[in-house]
A protein has these predicted regions:
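Feature captures the catalytic ectodomains and active-site-proximal regions of enzymes
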Residues: 1-266
Length: 266
């Protein structure tokens, strides 16, 4: 709640409407500098205050994006084009020595989205990642702390369990496709979701799930309702058309599991 980024898609009631939180545009990225959150401290801010320098390595197309500038504020961002270039970067001891290093490695996550968990392409990416870890372990400097992650777990969704919703403009469906936010009249919303396997959350349950809105920006982005889609199902709001194989955003154990590799050498 303190970040105001409540899901994959947000909805600003006052000005910007629907917002893709992964891809802010020229018009809506000003929200990330809103007075309610502009002084928010990140973990990188805390490390910097303690005199601990930190590196944040991530794909080149993510570096300097509005979202990266927001969530990685006060970290030193290093871009890499592909796994080969990442290997070259981490082989340079001057990059990693005596620092806290965070590496975001999304290739496995992307292959799971596009081809599915357990697919040949997914296994291939896992193998490439294993070789990268072996290389990192063999070339690491004497003093380093490195944390590597690749988003969180996914679940494959069969074609027959993909539900396309039909609704009028006075209802807004956003958030994630398995943990759905909705704005609009409750009776209308329940009718729209009546054939979707899952659970409708009331306002009290929503606050237990994502917390209380604590400032004006939170209130602008806070949903009226939430619907948790059952395991194995997914919904498609009107603004999303892409058919992937693997999805996450739900509350199953496999989706909430965050893969993390920790390397300590000092």
């Amino acid at each position: 709640m303190e970040t105001s980024i409540l899901g994959y898609y947000l909805f600003d009631r006052e000005e910007h409407g629907l917002i893709n939180a992964l891809n802010w545009n020229k018009e809506n990225k000003s929200l990330l500098k809103h007075p309610d959150i502009k002084d928010r401290k990140t973990i990188w801010t805390l490390l910097k205050a303690k005199g601990i320098t930190s590196n944040n390595l991530q794909p080149r197309d993510l570096v300097d994006s509005a979202l990266s500038e927001y969530i990685y504020k006060d970290s030193h961002q290093i871009a890499y084009k592909d796994t080969e270039e990442l290997n070259e970067i981490v082989s340079d001891s001057s990059v990693l020595d005596n620092r806290f290093n965070f590496i975001y490695y999304p290739n496995i996550d992307i292959s799971a989205h596009v081809f599915g968990v357990g697919s040949d392409q997914w296994h291939e990416e896992v193998g490439i990642f294993e070789m990268f870890i072996k290389n990192l372990n063999s070339t690491q400097s004497k003093k380093m702390y490195t944390l590597i992650t690749a988003d969180h777990g996914l679940t494959n969704i069969s074609n027959e369990n993909r539900i396309h919703l039909d609704y009028e403009e006075d209802v807004v469906v956003y958030g994630d496709q398995r943990s759905v936010y909705i704005n609009g009249d409750e009776t209308k919303v329940k009718k729209i979701f009546k054939n979707v396997p899952g659970r409708f959350l009331n306002s009290v349950e929503i606050r237990h799930l994502i917390g209380e809105p604590t400032n004006n920006l939170n209130k602008r982005l806070y949903p009226d309702h939430c619907f948790l889609v059952d395991d194995g199902y997914i919904i498609f709001p009107k603004h999303l058309k892409a058919n992937l194989v693997g999805y996450h955003g739900g509350i199953t154990e496999e989706e909430m599991r965050v893969p993390v590799i920790e390397i300590i050498n000092f």
